[in-house]
Amino acid sequence: AFNEIAAKAKEDLGITMEMTALDSDSVVQKVATQPKAFDIADIEYWMCKKVWPIGNLQAMDTSKIANYDKIVGIFKNGKLTPTSTIAQGTAPHTVSFVEGANGKSFSSEETGWMTMIPTIYNADTLGIRPDLINRPINTWAELLNPEFKGKASILDISSIGIMDMAMVCEAMGEIQYGDKGNMTKEEIDKTIGIFTEAKKAGQF
């Protein structure tokens, strides 16, 4: 899709876009330390708290975003529907808005200045092969089910992987977190301990 975006930018704006593929940590490092090395940064929501306060990024005027009204509530107020529960962790809406074009502090509500536009809904966290399993998978606890020993894996982006691990531990009834996005040291140690033992047992 990125090649198509570059081609459309060339057609509509007359500019040639050069894409650079980087891993998540390298993106954070580049945005923080090399602001003149890029014009547009494709960052993820969890990165915002790390890089936005540095002041190397500029917010977008929502009045110039043609389809702003079509951006779902998850990114504006944290809710997909009026009765939705707001997510733990870095819920997108908590880092979606700042006070002005050059604002460094996040706003708790829409301000007309947006940090990021959602372009991709990732489905990379949990991959299931129903054609091989032949039964429903409806709980995160299945990730540590011995049935899948040697066939399971977790995401190697630590800020996301730790949240997946927490959902597994909670689903197993091993830990009840106060806030998975702001764990205590005890919660972190217990979570890592459970997965370390699973790794030693050959689950991953």
Positions of PLM-derived features:
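Extracytoplasmic ligand-binding site segments that recognize negatively charged/polar headgroups
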Residues: 3, 52-204
